[in-house]
């Protein structure tokens, strides 16, 4: 049946159809190859925006650095990073005047956090630049490697387990004349295989000690590794993002804690809240502006876009802000917070893997690593790449580029929001001292500006003043990409406002479908996504019912588990038909075992196993929920699991779903090909780390987990816990005397082994 698409929209207000214009169906674009070109673009652009600044040379690393602060104010509309220190400080002072005690209180809250945070806070987060191996690693491994190197170099403050003590080690490490690190390498030998008598290449992984002098260590400590941002929709060009190393992360965390605490107290801030809470906050600001614009006043809203927000921000400005925010605070606290911006003023951007060359004629491929870009003959490159390399050469050191101005993506979201809000705050009548006034919303680089004035000239004047005020602190509102409307219709962080927020359902589209974790989790996540969208995103009952049917269909095709009485032939159908015929109560079979679907929009909150439990044959129940079933490598599952769902914009969200452990909750095994590479040593470290943590959790289940007081190693803690538990179990008669004495013997043996070591 052909549907004329325009008919669909006859009854729909235009703003509700906004969803259909979003590029959110189908697979998002991914990047291939190296990010070197994108990173060079970022570095070159950042320097271009600040080109009239002062050049200096870093005395420790020898890197050329550009400082645009208090530079000449722009005379045109081009983006620029010449923030004026006194203007930023004044904006902070006015922000404090409008919110008495805000900085003071946030500092007190942060001080408490600083003293209590444990170093394991840094294990959160995904990829982290590991300076010991000069490449990216999972955060936990990178942290473990850093601590291991610190300890072998006599830096042991971190043993207390507090993050602030680890950071003391970081500061101390920068004064050391040299650091000794352990790196992984691989050797190849040709040997004859006994079985096949063929020659094979054998790879062995070794660890070797290496000394790094002060300059090289500092460069590594200040390095941000770069990657290409994947899965960005609606853009033709890819762009680079940064992953900082462990030395920087802890300091950034404390600065962002302070800034988050400030943002929570600012009504114009779109961070750190999200979802419905954010919508409520925004609706309040709009309501305020609309009620205050009496019949005599006009009210207009700009859906704002800033040009290259990160590349025009400056760490030196952030240092000024922190200095102001923490005035009158203890010296140690001010110092610890000022280190992050100082490190960022001296940061180095790692250029990534370099370029790949291939000769069509000779069928040869060769990689030019980033380290060689400083010296290689440029005749091999095309015009645009040649220009990039020529421009970046004065900044290169050891395959990294000095990048003093600018903030890489996503590092100081909260603090830059505070800066943005401080300009919105200046729109009050008592500051503008004229007939126009403004207010708005800020969330990282995204903003909406509401201007009220008696007439159109006033609105224009207000917008101009806002634009120029922003320029003074290095914020560049884009005149091309921002647009103005009567208040009541605007967009902010992909929320569309039309006398209230319109559900932008298209953004949720990517998270519908089968996740591909395992049969049990996928069923649960699928129905939870539909349930959540009925609650939050105007997914109506009829559409939800259709979504559910499509999901079940998709699920059956993915896992080849069509109903037992279907005609569809797959490689599972023989087994599933047999099961169908043997089962008395067919309604009790799970969908993944060829059973019928019992879900409808009323019971989406119930896990499938619970929904069908009463309908199941007894022997099926026994097979399904049997931890001793030998065919399943079974993990213990808490009642709630977390899935990562991909909404269309912003980072992957974590979504909770109910997990019932069954024989369908399998875990796929790790791909073996990694075991033959140089990553293998790293993998083994990681597995050992994992095993230790799992063992520790067995001794300290989360319900009884108290943070260890005093300093004891994991082993000591587990041994003493084992002794206490054994005694309680023995005295209450849960274990026999022989078992009790055996446990005690094992504990003593472990302690003995530790002493010998």
UniProtKB/Swiss-Prot annotation:
Residues 286-483 form the RdRp catalytic domain. Phosphorylated by host PRKCA. It comes from the Viruses. Keywords: Eukaryotic host gene expression shutoff by virus, Eukaryotic host transcription shutoff by virus, Host cytoplasm, Host gene expression shutoff by virus, Host nucleus, Host-virus interaction, Inhibition of host RNA polymerase II by virus, Nucleotide-binding, Nucleotidyltransferase, Phosphoprotein, RNA-directed RNA polymerase, Transferase, Viral RNA replication, Viral transcription. GO terms for molecular function: nucleotide binding; RNA binding; RNA-directed RNA polymerase activity. Residues 55-64 have a biased composition (Polar residues). Residues 249-256 are annotated as: Promoter-binding site. The keyword Phosphoprotein applies. It is an enzyme of class 2 (transferase). Its EC number is 2.7.7.48. It catalyses: RNA(n) + a ribonucleoside 5'-triphosphate = RNA(n+1) + diphosphate. RNA-dependent RNA polymerase which is responsible for replication and transcription of virus RNA segments. The transcription of viral mRNAs occurs by a unique mechanism called cap-snatching. 5' methylated caps of cellular mRNAs are cleaved after 10-13 nucleotides by PA. In turn, these short capped RNAs are used as primers by PB1 for transcription of viral mRNAs. During virus replication, PB1 initiates RNA synthesis and copy vRNA into complementary RNA (cRNA) which in turn serves as a template for the production of more vRNAs. Influenza RNA polymerase is composed of three subunits: PB1, PB2 and PA. Interacts (via N-terminus) with PA (via C-terminus). Interacts (via C-terminus) with PB2 (via N-terminus); this interaction is essential for transcription initiation. Belongs to the influenza viruses polymerase PB1 family. This is RNA-directed RNA polymerase catalytic subunit. It comes from Influenza A virus (strain A/Victoria/3/1975 H3N2).
């Amino acid at each position: 049946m052909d549907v004329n698409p325009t008919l669909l929209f006859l009854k729909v207000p235009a703003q509700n159809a906004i969803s259909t214009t979003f590029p959110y169906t189908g697979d998002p674009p991914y990047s291939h190859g190296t990010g070197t070109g994108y990173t060079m673009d970022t570095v070159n652009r950042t320097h271009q925006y600040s080109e009239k600044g002062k050049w200096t040379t870093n005395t420790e690393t020898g890197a050329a650095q550009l400082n645009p602060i208090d530079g000449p104010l722009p005379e045109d509309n081009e983006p620029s990073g010449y923030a004026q220190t006194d203007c930023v400080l004044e904006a902070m002072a006015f922000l404090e005047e409008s919110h008495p005690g805000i900085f003071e209180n946030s500092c007190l809250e942060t001080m408490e956090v600083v003293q209590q945070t444990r170093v394991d806070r840094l294990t959160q987060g995904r990829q982290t630049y590991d300076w010991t191996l000069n490449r990216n690693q999972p955060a936990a491994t990178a942290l473990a490697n850093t601590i291991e190197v610190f300890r072998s170099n006599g830096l042991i403050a971190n043993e207390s387990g507090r993050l602030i003590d680890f950071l003391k080690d970081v500061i101390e490490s920068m004064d050391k004349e040299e650091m000794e690190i352990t790196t992984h390498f691989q050797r190849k030998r040709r040997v004859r295989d006994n079985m096949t008598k063929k020659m094979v290449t054998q790879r062995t992984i070794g660890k070797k000690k290496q000394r790094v002098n002060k300059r090289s260590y500092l460069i590594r400590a200040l390095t941000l590794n770069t990657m290409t941002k994947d899965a960005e929709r609606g853009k033709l060009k890819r762009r680079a993002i940064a992953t900082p190393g462990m030395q920087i992360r802890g300091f950034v965390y404390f600065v962002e804690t302070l800034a988050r605490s400030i943002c929570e107290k600012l009504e114009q801030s779109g961070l750190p809240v999200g979802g419905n809470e954010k919508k409520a906050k925004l609706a309040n600001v709009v309501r305020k502006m609309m009620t205050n614009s009496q019949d005599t006043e006009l009210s207009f809203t700009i859906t704002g876009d800033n040009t290259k927000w990160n590349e025009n921000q400056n760490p030196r400005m952030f240092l000024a802000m922190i200095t102001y925010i923490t005035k009158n605070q203890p010296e140690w606290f001010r110092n610890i917070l000022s280190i992050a911006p100082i490190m960022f003023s001296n940061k180095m951007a790692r250029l990534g893997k370099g370029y790949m060359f291939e000769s069509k004629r000779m069928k040869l491929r060769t990689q030019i690593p980033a380290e060689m870009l400083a010296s290689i003959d440029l005749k091999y490159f095309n015009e645009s790449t040649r220009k990039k390399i020529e421009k970046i050469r004065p900044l290169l050191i050891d395959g990294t580029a000095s990048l003093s101005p600018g903030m890489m993506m996503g590092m100081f979201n909260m603090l830059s929001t505070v800066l943005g809000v401080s300009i919105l705050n200046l729109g009050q009548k008592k500051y503008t001292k004229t007939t126009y006034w403004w207010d708005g919303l800020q969330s990282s680089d995204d903003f909406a500006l509401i201007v009220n004035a008696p007439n159109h000239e006033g609105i224009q004047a207000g917008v101009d003043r806002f634009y120029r005020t922003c320029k003074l602190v290095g914020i560049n509102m884009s005149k091309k990409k921002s647009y103005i409307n009567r208040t009541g219709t605007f967009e902010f962080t992909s929320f569309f406002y039309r006398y209230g927020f319109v559900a932008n359902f298209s953004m949720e589209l990517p998270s519908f479908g089968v996740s591909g974790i395992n049969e049990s989790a996928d069923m649960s996540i699928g129905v939870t996504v539909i349930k959540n969208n009925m609650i939050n995103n105007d997914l109506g009952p009829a559409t939800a019912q259709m979504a559910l049917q499509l999901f079940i269909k998709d699920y059956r095709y993915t896992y080849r588990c069509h109903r037992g009485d279907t005609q569809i032939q797959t490689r599972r159908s023989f087994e599933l038909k047999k099961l169908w015929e043997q089962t008395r109560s067919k309604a009790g079979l799970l969908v993944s075992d060829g059973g019928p679907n019992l879900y409808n929009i009323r019971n989406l909150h119930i896990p499938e196993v619970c929904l069908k439990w009463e309908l199941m044959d007894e022997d099926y129940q026994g097979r399904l929920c049997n931890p001793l079933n030998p065919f399943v490598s079974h993990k213990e599952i808490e009642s709630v699991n977390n899935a990562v769902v991909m909404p269309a914009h912003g980072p992957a969200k974590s979504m909770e779903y109910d997990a019932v452990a069954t024989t369908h909750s399998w875990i796929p095994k790790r791909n073996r090909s990694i075991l033959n590479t140089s990553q293998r040593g790293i993998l083994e470290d990681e597995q050992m780390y994992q095993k230790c943590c799992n063992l520790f959790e067995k001794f300290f289940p989360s319900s009884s987990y108290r943070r260890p007081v005093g300093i004891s190693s994991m082993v000591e803690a587990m041994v003493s816990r084992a002794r206490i538990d054994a005694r309680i179990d023995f005295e209450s008669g849960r274990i026999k005397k022989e078992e009790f004495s055996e446990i005690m013997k094992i504990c003593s043996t472990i302690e003995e082994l530790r002493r010998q070591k």
